[in-house]
């Protein structure tokens, strides 16, 4: 049951982000303020899950990975907030931001997991989450972003999201192989 919530969040993220720019615009008014809000939320969510792993991971490797995620995403989130302030953009979340509820359910599920079950659920969540964010960036968010400075920031940080996904997958593979 707990695993379903974590995977459900990732599926929800993938579904929201997998829509075409035209469909997304019609459904969620995907303008720069909305994209800035999504960017901020994605970073905030990974700060939360990273901090949870830094506290609840059963191994030093998981705790260190969680701390690194939280640190990296705090930095990226601040860059986004600084740019939004500079540009005078007020982040405006989509009216029906179902992903926020799904994130809350995923965090609740992770908090309820213990030890190695936590580690695996966390890593599976991180792989799926980063994949969904990367898909969103390339297929939906970048094509819809109008401001060039915002596009440059999103483009600049995308490789870090990729690195996080690969690192999570490597840790997950290592954990599976150890069974």
Show where each model-derived region lies:
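His/Met- and acidic-residue-enriched segments that coordinate or traffic transition-metal cofactors
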Residues: 2-9, 17-179
């Amino acid at each position: 049951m707990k695993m379903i919530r974590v995977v459900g969040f990732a599926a929800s993220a993938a579904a929201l982000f997998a829509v075409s720019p035209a469909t997304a615009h019609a459904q969620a008014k995907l303008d720069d303020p909305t994209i800035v809000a999504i960017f901020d939320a994605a970073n905030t969510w990974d700060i939360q899950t990273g901090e949870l792993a830094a506290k609840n991971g059963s191994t030093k490797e998981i705790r260190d990975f969680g701390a690194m995620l939280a640190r990296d995403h705090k930095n990226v989130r601040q860059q986004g907030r600084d740019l939004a302030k500079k540009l005078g953009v007020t982040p405006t979340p989509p009216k029906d931001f179902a992903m926020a509820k799904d994130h809350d359910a995923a965090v609740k599920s992770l908090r309820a997991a213990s030890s190695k079950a936590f580690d695996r659920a966390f890593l599976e969540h991180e792989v799926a989450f980063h994949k969904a964010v990367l898909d969103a960036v390339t297929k939906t968010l970048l094509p819809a972003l109008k401001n060039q400075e915002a596009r440059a920031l999103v483009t600049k940080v995308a490789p870090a999201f990729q690195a996080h996904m690969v690192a999570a997958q490597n840790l997950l593979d290592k954990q599976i192989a150890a069974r």
